[in-house]
Amino acid sequence: MWIISSNPKYVDISGQQLCDMLREGGEADNVLMTLSMRRYQQMDIAFAAAKGEGCWRHFLEPDFMNHVSREDDISKLTYIKEMFVGHHINYEVNKCTEIVLPVKFDLKWSTYIWDYSRTKIFVLDPTMHNGDESDKEIQQRHRKVADELHGSIELCIKSFFIGWEPDMRRWNTCFPKGLVTGICERKDTWIYATHLARNWMGTKLKRDVNPGDGIMHARMNLLVDLLGTEDNIGHLPKRYKDCLFPKKDKQNICCRN
């Protein structure tokens, strides 16, 4: 396995699986989406630390949605609890202003963002303006899902934290426009969802991604991000290790140890 991550639960992925999913037209599974969210969290932590700041957003994993949709008692599930608290989380989740969750339903991926500073849920659906059905119909389905997830996140906060009591009433669910140029095909919704999760800056995107070459570029960017996963206990081929972790960095690590 090229990448193995053990917190908050064990997941792994092989080089062949990465190749199959990240090639043109490849579709991601829950494992790839989970590893992507974990990697984005690591990158956010490093960025915040470099600026001497705290982490400002918290990424949840896609299985959160799966447990909610099955009507599991999420307040009793260790895996769900460890998405919010645990020794592997080295920042204060209760001080994050956003919670980010990749959501899959109707065989398509979207990104949901809970913005605590604005008391809004942003639903970033890359297929919203494809034109194959009305925006109203799509929004109605999303609102139902968002309401269920909203109540579940509120339950998790009440169950897993002491002293964090955000007002979760009367939040608005918003559907930003202009996220995608052109038509987003179903097979590409997952790469848009990861891009939107990474690049949403509160009211707009930091970087756009367009159909065609832009999609393939986003896939390759994600590959580089994933191969740089910290605390990876998998067996990454030496040629990639040498590219991602130059000898100079290895020597510095040895000296520090």
Predicted feature residues:
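Enzymes acting in ubiquitin/UBL processing and closely related pathways
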Residues: M1-N257
